[in-house]
């Protein structure tokens, strides 16, 4: 599983997203790739995924969120993808 973070240097919420994803990547063992939204590839992904402003988060190539990240929602999404929901 890969998480893609579309970011920008002057974006405060992007720094929050990086901190959240650092924690979750360690906890869940997922790969995180960061891409500047102002690059041609970043612009193309943002447009395709409906990312209006950074940070934009994609989970396995699918748009998940943009703007201020929610660690709780992202954690639930990772658990769903990894098959951990409802298991003890």
Protein language model features and the residues they cover:
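Non-catalytic, surface beta->alpha helical segment in thiol-disulfide oxidoreductase systems
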Residues: 59-87
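Short, structurally constrained coil/turn elements
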Residues: 26-28
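Structural micro-motif
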Residues: 48-58
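Thiol-based oxidoreductase modules, predominantly thioredoxin-like and allied folds used
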Residues: 30-42
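Local sequence-structure signature of Cys/Sec-based thiol-disulfide redox active-site neighborhoods
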Residues: 1-24
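Generic recognition of short, well-ordered alpha-helical segments
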Residues: 15-19, 44, 69
């Amino acid at each position: 599983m890969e998480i893609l973070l579309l970011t920008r240097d002057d974006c405060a919420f992007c720094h929050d997203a990086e901190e959240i994803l650092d924690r979750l990547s360690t906890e869940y063992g997922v790969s995180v790739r960061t891409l500047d939204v102002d690059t041609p590839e970043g612009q193309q992904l943002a447009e395709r995924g409906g990312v209006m402003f950074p940070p934009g988060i994609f989970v396995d190539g699918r748009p998940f969120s943009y703007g201020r990240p929610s660690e709780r929602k992202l954690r639930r999404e990772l658990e769903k993808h990894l098959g951990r929901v409802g298991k003890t």
